[in-house]
Amino acid sequence: MLIVGGLIGVALIFDYINGFHDAANSIATVVSTRVLSPGKAVIWAAFFNFVAAFTFGTAVARTVGSGMIDINTVTFSVIFGGLTGAIIWDLITWYFGLPTSSSHALVGGYAGAAVAKTGFAAVVTGGWTKTIIFIFLSPLIGMTAGLTLMIAIHWLFRWTPPSRVDRWFRRLQLISAAFFSLNHGANDAQKTMGIIAGVLYTAHYIDTFYIPFWVVLIAYTAISLGTLAGGWRIIHTMGSKITKLQPVGGFAAETGAAIALLVATQTGVPVSTTHAITGAIVGVGATRRVSAVRWGVAGQIVWAWIFTIPAAFTIAAAAYALLRISGAQ
């Protein structure tokens, strides 16, 4: 009982860290365009993170919990090692202000601990295939949607005074930020649900793998509280270092990224909110001119993405090995 409670607690800590680490993804654009202050923005994002609990299903949770790693090979040590790898990598990247993916840190860590236990036979190829495809697809969807929206908006409002357009989109950006936060909560909180359900299944508290509703509620609560804690280092990178944004651009970026997340969530794929919003911001910036995008900063972010899964994998494998040496199963 204590082990189960402890692992659920660690999973919720990850969910909380995910919230404040990825809060920047939800609010960076609405803060950088000065539509909302950072304080109001995190409250706005946290509220819609939680509302997602009553809006979406649990397809992503099922993929993370049993569709990427053979659930029958999972032990408490595997779960703890996986969470340790994800949490440590998230804290390292948060400290340096790098907007990496908490999602990929989690699945990378989970895989690292499982492989350390039983080898690559523990890996479920189908779940990993669609996840890897979306690593490339989600930023492309975000970028294409952001680019297309910006072109369409410029054409539709080409005869409208810029000051009036700016005023309209300052209001509309509240809606786009809510839409993005809703989808951020839906995809990201479900990953923690999958891990908690794995704990319950391993402990034989549930006979078949499913997501109890109380797990849904505590996961969304944890990510919402984490979002309230914010994460200004990453907000600065996402909201101003990649490209300068106006309310029109903020609206297009948030909406484009939300579309990418919605597609992934409906198909049960655990994707990166960071990838989606970064791709959308790049697409928006490129509509002005290619040089409007600070490609050096974008390149640093891409390198952080590339290292996330192997880094979390390695840390988790090491954590699992230490647990085994100490006698844990």
Language model feature labels by segment:
Residues 1-329:
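Multi-pass alpha-helical transmembrane bundle typical of ion/small-solute transporters
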